Design a protein with these regions (language model features):
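Fe(II)/2-oxoglutarate oxygenase catalytic core
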Residues: 1-118, 123-170
Length: 170
């Protein structure tokens, strides 16, 4: 994946920043899902922004099943609660795979232009793009929502991203 923001909002192009600010103004996962009441967006958009899965050699890009890092890269007492993705590729025809938190329930969601995807993050929220449309790059806009946690809770969480291309879906 390319274009992932690690440098702060001043490095995001103005039109993209306007769209991201609009989404966080009106999209509140606490109200929509009711699973948390304390998730907030990181307005520096660390780990978010424009993301692209490139189409290498006209064979299609690939983003295997993975769990994102749960702890924020610069605010070590922030835990990722939700990932929100906006589909930006109009002609892309594939799916977004999601394993629910117990690691057993599988969902396949069609990737659509201008569709907003959101899911609750955990150490077992596996997701990826195993089927890629050949000849096209997949572009998304990503925004992460976080909660504040104690040092003790942070120390009990596996902090690094995990990858597994051998997950089987029933």
């Amino acid at each position: 994946v390319q274009w992932c923001n690690r440098l702060g909002r001043e490095n995001i192009a103005s039109p993209v920043l306007i769209l991201m600010d609009y989404i966080v103004t009106y999209f509140d996962p606490n109200k929509i899902f009711g699973l948390t009441d304390n998730a907030f967006p990181d307005l520096s958009y660390y780990g978010g922004g424009m993301m692209m899965t490139p189409n290498k050699n006209e064979e299609g890009g690939y983003l295997g099943m993975h769990v994102d890092a749960i702890i924020h890269g610069t605010n070590k007492n922030w835990k990722r609660e939700y990932s929100v993705l906006l589909g930006l590729s109009e002609e892309y025809d594939s799916s977004f795979d999601l394993l629910v938190h117990n690691g057993k329930e599988h969902g396949r969601i069609p990737y659509k232009f201008n569709r907003l995807y959101a899911f609750k993050c955990s150490e077992n929220s596996w997701h990826g793009l195993p089927e890629i449309t050949k000849g096209l790059d997949k572009k998304t806009l990503g925004i992460m929502y976080w909660s504040k946690i104690s040092d003790e809770e942070r120390d009990s969480i596996e902090t690094k991203a995990k990858f597994n291309d051998n997950l089987e879906f029933n």
